[in-house]
Amino acid sequence: PIWSEEQLESEKKVVINEIYEKEDEVTLEKIYDKAIWRKNPLKRGILGSEENVKGFTVDDLVGYKKEIFSKNNVTLVITGAIDEEKSREIFEEFGKIKINEGVERKEKVEVIKGRQFKREPDVKLKNFASWNIVDVQLSFDVDLTKIKENELLFLNSIIGGGDGSYLQTEIRENQGLVYDIYSCVDIFSKESILSIIFSIDKSRLQLSILEIIKILKQLKNIISKKDVDRNMAFFTENLWYWAEETKELNFQLGSDFLNDKEVLTIEDRIMANERIDFQRMREISEMIFRKENMSLIVIGPTKGITENKLRELLYGKYDNEYNEKD
């Protein structure tokens, strides 16, 4: 081993101090991850836990390094100003490099197992009395075996991906409830989370949730061809910007390959997006925005608000609506 046990112990102290610092930080994302992922490893920080860091040895570290950095566990993605022949030469030369040959990676664990997306809905509060406003994240589970990734990204753009989206127009501009509100997606192999994120005065929290739910309920009837046309450029001609600076394209191709997804060229992506229509957007909005897919995380000055009150607000009044058949 390159490191001695003494050197490793010294490095562990640095990492553990960083873990302490991260644990002291209060973020919506941390609370959200714990609430959504529960026992799944995705709820943990990238640094791991103090217990795990203290527990491994130099031999453990070297073994793991060999397992990860091995010839059977390498993906090389090349994009940019390079022709096919030169790419082939690079791949051939790269293939000759001996990187821990014969070391097999252990079977990969599924990111999400079992009933993760058939769980009971969650409402979580975290009180910080000194804050002026509450941070809110309303999230919905998405099954990517039923909804394509590009369809989800397109729907996200329509809902809250930018100016002109339904949430920005109604919640921020028309009603003036929030300074900013947006939606985003976290994508994994076969699952995704679509989240609506905003900050608001506590006195307006319940009203904002009601208004957002009202919009989400209406999407299955109001998404129009105009909405699709307005967003289409972002998913077709704008993709050619990837060819000017190919870092994002490179990352996307590598990510798709590692997640066992179809690896698409820019032309393929444009063609797939051009097939999206408003009827499909209505259909998947009805599939996603349902009671059983929903979680709510609120942090800030939450005194006087209870999880039961928010559950009643979310799952009670709109129970029949969210239990409609697909």
Predicted segments, located by residue:
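Charge-rich, well-structured scaffold segments of protease-associated domains
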Residues: 1-106, 142-143, 173-326
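His/Glu-based metal-binding/catalytic segments typifying zinc-dependent metallopeptidases
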Residues: 102-166, 321-326
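Short amphipathic alpha-helix segments
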Residues: 166-174
